[in-house]
Structure formats: C-alpha cells, structure tokens
Amino acid sequence: MAEPRGIISAMLTPFTSDVGPVDYEWLPGYLRFLADGGLHGVLALGTTGEGPSMSVAERIRTLEIIMAHRGELSVIAGTGCAALTDTIALSRAAIDLGVDAILVMPPFYIKQPDETGILAYFRALCDALPADARVMLYHIPQVTGVPITRTIIDGLLASHGTQFYGLKDSSGDWEHSKMLIDSYPQLRIFTGSDRLIARALAGGAAGAITALSSAFPKLARAVFDAFHQGGDVAAAQARLSAVRDLVNPINTPPALKAALTWTSDLPETALRLPLLPLSNEEVAALRAAYERIMAGTTP
C-alpha cells in the first residue's frame, strides 16, 4: 500500500444528471487531470465527492474505476454511512480493492450520541476489518454534528491501535489540528482546510485533504512546493485562500464543478440532488473573480 501524504484531492464525483447514475466514463480523464496537477493522492466519496448521496453499490463501482486508473495516486476511500452495516460492507469492499486507507465519519443522523456509543461504533467497524486495515476518522462536526473527541481517539488507540491510522480534521480550527499533531504522533493528521495547508505542513501534519485541489490542483500543489523548496509560502497560501473566499459563499461542489469547465478540458458534469448547479451569472462572476486573482489584480 502507498503511504497517503502531501496534497490530496477531495475529488468530485461525476453524475450524468441530477437524478442520473454516476458518469463512470468521466473518471479516468479526471484522475489524469489531478495527477497532471501534481497531486499526491485522492480522497474518493467524501463530502466534496457527494458520497453520502450515493448508494453503497455506486460507491463500490466508483472505487473500482478509480483503482483501475489511479496511476501513482494514493487513494483514500470515504466509507462512512449512517448504518454501521453499510459502513462495514463498504469498508470491506474498499479494502479488498486495495485502497491505501479508509476515512470514516461518525454516524450522523442520531443526534447527541454518547461518546461511548460512537467509540463502540468505530470499534465494531475495526473488529469487522482485516488486522492490517488503515482506518482514518473524519472530524467535521459542522456537518455531522458529532465531534471526534479525545475520549474517542484515546479509546480507539487503546483497543485498535494497529488499525487506527490517522484523522482528517476539517474543523478549520488550527489550534485543534495542532493539538492533534502534538498529542498523537502515532497518527497521521491531515488538515481538511484549504486555508491551513501552509500551517499544517509547517506544524508537522502528514498533509492536506482539501476541496479546492479537486478543481485547482496546481494552486494547492504550489503551497506544498513553496514550503519544501524554499519559495514564497505566504504568497502561495494567500492565493489559494483568496480562491477559497470565492467558493465559500457558494455550496462547494457546485462551485468546483463549474470551475472545472475552465480549469480542465473535461466535459461538464452534473450534481446530484439536493445540490443545484450555479446559474450562468454565478459562473461568470466566479470565473471573473478567479481570473482577477490569478492576474494579481484583486485588492
């Protein structure tokens, strides 16, 4: 298995229409685009990839295509589902396909669950997987409503330390990410924030798994290269953060799928309901603002 590290795209999932199937034929070209953009790996079926809007069967087939066309990219599979049985089935399938790690969000429908129950959920998952499985937990409480607390982390390390591989922190809180990096050197900690890539690299993170790299891979890779090659890290991060500021007022997958129409040669791809595409006016405004940033004319 490859070692996930560096800049990893929270890759998009293509659909033929808002109620249609996955556009599997679109995926190989997209993976080439991400690799050509200098990325080290991909996270499939995550938040940006609309994974929770897909069936288990669709997700498995998507992973089959990705693994067949991954090239040198590492692959992390988002396998968290509301039902533990689905999470186990999808995780087993992903591991059988040879993914380098799985990323699992906590069960998100039952509100205010006890930490003991969440820990038991993750332990049951690990018990159902091979001993050498690499399990990453997904901390994105603003979406799931369920934080990955230190009690959960400590408990899973105590019981399944050989399988517990890492954590993606998408809280956007650098102090929280730094605490994880400093407190758990045995875990690979990834930031999920485009704005925190430079800080994460300087602070000892394994890398960054971010949304913008799914449509702007070269901008994200530029931060990595500047950090490792003695370049202007602040300038590279500022440019990426400025693009993030454009996307923030808009729902992320619609903005990124729109952006792909001018950052790549890929055909336009659809979103799955309940997500809606941007209007023509919104797309034009987004592109114009992006071009001003790239030209260095944005105040």
From Swiss-Prot:
Coiled-coil segments on the chain, per record: none
Q: Tell me one GO molecular function of this protein.
A: 4-hydroxy-tetrahydrodipicolinate synthase activity
Enzyme Commission identifier(s): 4.-.-.-
User: TM segments?
Assistant: none
Instruction: Fetch the Pfam families from UniProt.
Output: DHDPS
In terms of InterPro entries, this protein maps to:
Aldolase_TIM, DapA-like, Schiff_base-form_aldolases_CS
- What's the protein name? Uncharacterized DapA-like lyase Caur_1967
Query: Which organism is the protein's source?
Result: Chloroflexus aurantiacus (strain ATCC 29366 / DSM 635 / J-10-fl)
